[in-house]
Amino acid sequence: MQNSLPIELISIVRNLEEKARSVGLDFFTTMFELVDYKQLNEIAAYGGFPTRYPHWRWGMEYERLSKSYTYGLSVIYEMVINNDPCYAYLLRANSLVAQKTVVAHVYGHSDFFKNNFWFSKTNRKMLNQMANHATIVRKIIDEVGQEEVENFIDVCLSLENLIDIQAPFKAKPKTLTQEQKEKAIHQPVTKIESKPYMDSYVNPNDFLEKQQSRIVEQAKKLQSFPEEPVQDVLKFLIEYAPMSTWQRRVLSMIRDENYYFAPQAQTKILNEGWATYWHSKMMTSIAPLDASEIIDYCDHYSGVVASQPGQINPYRLGVELLRHIEERWDKGRFGKSYVETDDPKTRRDWNTSINLGAKKLFEVRSLHNDVTFIDEFLDEDFCHKSKMFLYDYNTRTGKFVISNRDFKEIKKTILKQLTNIGQPIIKVIDGNFKNRGELLLHHFHDGDDLKYDYLLECIKNIYKIWTRPVHIETLVENVKRRIAFDGNTHTIEKI
């Protein structure tokens, strides 16, 4: 796709790139392409990439985006790909003011992709990788047939969230050989050396019993399969499920792609806040707009940060919290002295003019994801200043009403929504359950029950890959249940 920029836009891009680098942004080489709304919807339907493996979900997403644009419900102003070089798409129909804003916004994203810790393990050549995946799937379709491949991809996509988003940053566990396992299982109880007459005091029975219990527990652990609960369910299926070579390859590709997209979900608020912070700064002070453009910019900006009761706007929350951090660190509103000050007037007037705000913002950009960002910096002052509340829907009036103003509850609710990117934590507990090769999963309950219809379809699709009965333990209305699918029927039992 080659859509060269007009001379006027090239000049804008060069100017904003120079200004962005001058304030410390460090981004990949960024390539801009100009596209119409149909082309942008196609790219957006593909998850931001110009090509993907053939599947009906892309067409469905394109129809949704097209109708949303036609009815005036949404407009995509830009798309940016985490790649080196970074590719960004500009909507041809945008006004010149919008194009300037979007270009500045893109440089913020590109800087974030390059420097944020949570993106450090992503494939920086994913544009090529996606094209390779598309080629591989097309070859498999030619060999196996479209319907069979498409049906298997349907199954894989329904399970794509069963990964461990922390896995790229975890050290690989040491694996023991069978000989080492046998030695550990049959090791004798270790006694502390002592004189015979002191043995009963140095090695009392309760000490020896504890040692024996530890050995027994370790033996059980080493003999279990897997030895530790595995959150990356897809990896477990890839390694141990009885699949054909092409199926294993397709599932591996879908897993790899989901790991690529995971950091974007983990940092949505901070990433969008960072890009919005810099496009706002660029348009108003670093590379200011003309007086004739300010009204259009403000109208565009107000649309970006608009919020509604009961919903989190990541652009608004991200940029406002970053500005709050900047103000706090510029005025020295951190540390023991400030935290221990209870007087509201003293806190409000606190200003040591330390001016560490900019330095702190770059530190936040480098180290945090949404959970740590909110957990560390969302404080009571910000909550009150931003008028953040919890809302419930009133069925009688048909409106959202404030249900809770308590800061701790508000923060807890936001963090709960963000933990594990909003997905349930499910782990493989036993790959040989009942000693019959059946699969046992466990849902780590966080207060919310699993959606029952989703749960039934999930274990049904895992069965299609595992080919043996699949069980999952969870809480249903605070009662421990084990739900299973044996290839024909679902069963549920109390445990």
Where are these regions (language model features)?
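Fold-level signature of zinc-dependent metallopeptidase catalytic domains
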Residues: Q2-L5, L9, R92, F113, ...
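Short pre-active-site segment immediately N-terminal to the catalytic Zn-binding motif
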Residues: L65, P85-V102, F261-T267
